[in-house]
């Protein structure tokens, strides 16, 4: 059996090349061919010696995932279904904007967290994806889109680990994939443009801060433990206080000076004025310990098994106003891709909004945001 080179970060690929009797710099050449040029045939790699190409041909391969289907939304959003074997499929979503392209990547086939408002969680958990299966989504999408859009430059500028699965419950495979995304010989993405979204796996938030601090988004969805435990069962193990303490620790290492909290707006469940006021009190308590945050309010995308309904827009905007009046940066999601079931919650999380807010965050810390209006956004980190 040969080795799939998509399973390696650069360090792993260098070790593999050494096993073939090659110097480590050959791994950099090989890495560039795979990730920057999208090569899958060693004979394309003309700056590698023929003897090395022959060794690679008998010991390795470059194999992405098989595409089951591709769906394109009226708004330009593209969703792919990939076959990962044993009857499992995963979903990957590309969200185009005028100044950026965001890819939402899955980390697991299914999800074990079981959030009430997420259709993937209702499907149950099958297995973790390998590093190669995670990075294959980016590898395929980037090079497909270059051809599809007729572009010779990078199309995907931002990656969000917000597709199917809880990324931090697949940490050993996630970490090398993140390193490939960030490596200048791979995709060269900045840490600010790669976001890991988590439902709150506290020990792994601390590990990510140490190993590979990228932008962090946390699925909060409630201001107090009883309600959050009902919506996000993982809260029973890692309650809100522990989660926010971990977020404060993470912030000291993070590439951005704030943590994004995702909040799915559920009619009559977590969208009342008292919930907003409880959030304000909660954030003020932790701000005293150094936590800076941004809230992203997400209109719920209903599905039959949930038994939940979407908050109407006036209720969402009233909720946002309470947060904003308290000086908390707040955005409201504009749904994308819902006509192809690619919107938030129809996979396993947030796929769109990581808007650039550096100046407003600085103003928030100075308590200057009382009169700023709520912004409806649909982009990714600039």
Swiss-Prot record:
Reaction(s) this enzyme catalyzes, per UniProt: adenosine(2503) in 23S rRNA + 2 reduced [2Fe-2S]-[ferredoxin] + 2 S-adenosyl-L-methionine = 2-methyladenosine(2503) in 23S rRNA + 5'-deoxyadenosine + L-methionine + 2 oxidized [2Fe-2S]-[ferredoxin] + S-adenosyl-L-homocysteine; adenosine(37) in tRNA + 2 reduced [2Fe-2S]-[ferredoxin] + 2 S-adenosyl-L-methionine = 2-methyladenosine(37) in tRNA + 5'-deoxyadenosine + L-methionine + 2 oxidized [2Fe-2S]-[ferredoxin] + S-adenosyl-L-homocysteine
Record domain Radical SAM core: where: 97-339
An annotated Gene Ontology molecular function: 4 iron, 4 sulfur cluster binding
Cofactor binding summary note: Binds 1 [4Fe-4S] cluster. The cluster is coordinated with 3 cysteines and an exchangeable S-adenosyl-L-methionine.
Binding residue positions for S-adenosyl-L-methionine: 165-166, 197, 219-221, 301
UniProt keyword annotation of RNA-binding present: no
List of residues binding [4Fe-4S] cluster: 111, 115, 118
Swiss-Prot/TrEMBL cofactor(s): [4Fe-4S] cluster
UniProt cross-references to InterPro entries, sorted A to Z: Aldolase_TIM, Methyltransferase_A, RlmN_N, RNA_MTrfase_RlmN, rRNA_lsu_MTrfase_RlmN/Cfr, rSAM
GO cellular component: cytoplasm
Class of enzymatic activity (EC top level): transferase
Primary site of residence: cytoplasm
Record's keyword annotation contains Transferase: yes
Alphabetical keyword list: 4Fe-4S, Cytoplasm, Disulfide bond, Iron, Iron-sulfur, Metal-binding, Methyltransferase, rRNA processing, S-adenosyl-L-methionine, Transferase, tRNA processing
Biological process according to GO: rRNA base methylation; tRNA methylation
Covalent S-S links between cysteines: 104-344
Pfam family, one: Radical_SAM
EC number: 2.1.1.192
Function: Specifically methylates position 2 of adenine 2503 in 23S rRNA and position 2 of adenine 37 in tRNAs. m2A2503 modification seems to play a crucial role in the proofreading step occurring at the peptidyl transferase center and thus would serve to optimize ribosomal fidelity.
Additional detail: Reaction proceeds by a ping-pong mechanism involving intermediate methylation of a conserved cysteine residue.
HAMAP family: RNA_methyltr_RlmN
Family: Belongs to the radical SAM superfamily. RlmN family.
Protein name per the record: Dual-specificity RNA methyltransferase RlmN
Organism encoding this protein: Polaromonas naphthalenivorans (strain CJ2)
Gene name in the database record: rlmN
């Amino acid at each position: 059996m040969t080795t799939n080179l998509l399973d390696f970060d650069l360090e792993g690929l260098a070790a593999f090349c050494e096993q073939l009797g090659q110097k480590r710099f050959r791994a950099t050449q090989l890495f560039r061919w795979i990730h920057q040029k999208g090569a899958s045939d060693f004979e394309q790699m003309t700056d590698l010696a023929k003897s090395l190409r022959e060794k690679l041909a008998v010991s390795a391969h470059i194999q992405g995932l098989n595409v089951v289907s591709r769906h394109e939304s009226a708004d330009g959003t593209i969703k792919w279904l990939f076959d990962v074997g044993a009857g499992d499929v995963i979903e990957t979503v590309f969200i185009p904007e005028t100044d950026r392209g965001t890819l939402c990547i899955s980390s697991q086939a299914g999800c074990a967290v079981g959030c009430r408002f997420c259709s993937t969680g209702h499907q149950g958990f099958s297995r973790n994806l390998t590093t190669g299966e995670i990075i294959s989504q980016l590898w395929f999408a980037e090079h497909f889109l270059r051809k599809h859009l007729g572009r010779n430059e990078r199309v995907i500028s931002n990656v969000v680990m917000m597709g199917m699965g809880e990324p931090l419950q697949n940490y050993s495979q996630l970490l090398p994939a993140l390193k490939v995304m960030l490596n200048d010989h791979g995709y060269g993405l900045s840490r600010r443009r790669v976001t890991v979204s988590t439902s709150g796996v506290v020990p792994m938030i601390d590990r990510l801060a140490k190993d590979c601090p990228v932008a962090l988004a946390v699925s909060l969805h409630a201001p107090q433990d009883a309600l959050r435990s009902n919506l996000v069962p993982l809260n029973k193990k890692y309650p809100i206080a522990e989660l926010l303490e971990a977020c404060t620790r993470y912030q000291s290492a993070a590439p951005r000076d704030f943590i994004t909290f995702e909040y799915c707006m559920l009619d009559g469940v977590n969208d009342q004025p008292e919930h907003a006021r409880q959030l304000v009190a909660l954030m003020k308590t932790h701000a005293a310990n150094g936590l800076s945050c941004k809230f992203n309010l997400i209109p719920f995308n209903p599905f039959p098994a949930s038994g939940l309904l979407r908050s109407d827009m006036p209720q969402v905007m009233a909720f946002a106003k309470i947060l904003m009046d308290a000086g908390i940066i707040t955005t409201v999601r504009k749904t994308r891709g819902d006509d192809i079931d690619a919107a938030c919650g129809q996979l396993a999380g947030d796929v769109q909004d990581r808007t650039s807010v550096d100046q407003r965050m600085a103003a928030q810390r100075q308590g200057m945001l009382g009169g700023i209006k709520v912004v409806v956004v649909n982009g990714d980190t600039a």
